[in-house]
């Protein structure tokens, strides 16, 4: 119980601290560029035309809504985080308790099993089920979080309170509205998890020397590196999921010119890929302006 409470508190603290970052990221993912590009330098010192970074973007939001505005959507996101942590822990606890009778077997067999790829598959499968269950239950809060952020673009107040947002979504879209963008989000999580754990196992088994004294530390590093690599590869699923969650929901940020009306998440994926926007919002610094791209800032000036 104490471990669960500490995880909830730690997760809530990190959620609060990262809220402004996520807010900016979501607006960029939608395609909202309120500030004009500037001439800057990339990490190699070369002059390039850049879009505003995280701090300039956050300062723009704060100049309109104040610093408190940077924490828009925090309440449903906290609810999602707390509920997700509890569900994830309960599912893993169920598997651990169901495995206890099997622990009476031979110690030698247990050691051989623990070092095999079968154990990696078993643990990854359990983690996948736990994460998927948490994602499925908390996705309605995720949708509300995204929509409350995106309404900054059109200065709407459609999704302000948690209860009012639930009523609005149910009245306009039914139960299905609470799960907009769920499929690409689940697929991204599952692919990322399996890719991360499989690569970490291969590195730890075949690339690292088991006789090294810092073996455990090196394994933790390899897990972190493979996790970062997997998240980079599966980022398009995150982008598509977030866009589908706000698409055609009655907000300016989910409608043209910021976002086309997508018929499905596959349609969204194809259109982003065709436009070369599969990594939009992945970087919050050194955001180079792609050649031939038109942003909402330019469209606003033409109106």
From Swiss-Prot:
The chain crosses the membrane at residues 16-36, 78-92, 136-156, 181-199, 232-252, 281-303. It is found in: Mitochondrion outer membrane. Pfam families: Mito_carr. It is a multi-pass membrane protein. Its main location: mitochondrion. Expressed in a wide variety of tissues. Predominant expressed in liver, kidney, heart, skeletal muscle and testis. One of its GO terms (biological process) is negative regulation of mitochondrial membrane potential. Disruption phenotype: Mice homozygous for a knockout allele exhibit abnormal mesoderm development, disorganized extraembryonic tissue, lack of amnion and chorion formation, decreased embryo size and lethality at around 7.5 dpc. Conditional knockout in the liver decreases the sensitivity of mice to Fas-induced hepatocellular apoptosis and prevents the recruitment of tBID to liver mitochondria. Conditional knockout in skeletal muscle results in increased mitochondrial mass and metabolism granting protection against diet-induced obesity. Residues 2-15, 93-135, 200-231 are mitochondrial intermembrane. The modification N-acetylalanine is found at residue 2. GO terms for cellular component: mitochondrial inner membrane; mitochondrial outer membrane; mitochondrion. Solcar repeats lie at residues 2-98, 118-206. Residues 37-77, 157-180, 253-280 are cytoplasmic. Keywords: Acetylation, Apoptosis, Membrane, Mitochondrion, Mitochondrion outer membrane, Repeat, Transmembrane, Transmembrane helix. GO terms for molecular function: membrane insertase activity. Signal peptide: none annotated. Belongs to the mitochondrial carrier (TC 2.A.29) family. Interacts with p15BID. Protein insertase that mediates insertion of transmembrane proteins into the mitochondrial outer membrane. Catalyzes insertion of proteins with alpha-helical transmembrane regions, such as signal-anchored, tail-anchored and multi-pass membrane proteins. Does not mediate insertion of beta-barrel transmembrane proteins. Also acts as a receptor for the truncated form of pro-apoptotic BH3-interacting domain death agonist (p15 BID) and has therefore a critical function in apoptosis. Regulates the quiescence/cycling of hematopoietic stem cells (HSCs). This is Mitochondrial carrier homolog 2. It comes from Mus musculus. The lineage of its organism: Eukaryota, Metazoa, Chordata, Craniata, Vertebrata.
